[in-house]
Amino acid sequence: MKGYVVCVYKGISSEEKLKEYAIKARSAVEKYKGKFLIRGGKTTTNEGSKSPRTVVIEFPSYDDANSFYNSREYKEAHKILMSHAERHHQTIEGS
């Protein structure tokens, strides 16, 4: 079954750091054969709090998605954004 990384941002304090993070994270996504399904875009908040950004990445498997998140490459990218964004981050197994 496919694996998905879902990231719902609650707040972003630096668009510049977000761009820097995105460039570095992209190479880790590609290394683990991830495919971006959603990166920002137009949204309608139907329930709950409005989010400034949502990202969904599909991986060949749940294990690949977890390997991506726990990889050295992604951890380096994550450090760039840590104090510049608040977000909810999950790895989900598809059906």
What are these regions (language model features)?
Residues 62-90:
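C-terminal structural segments of small proteins and small subunits
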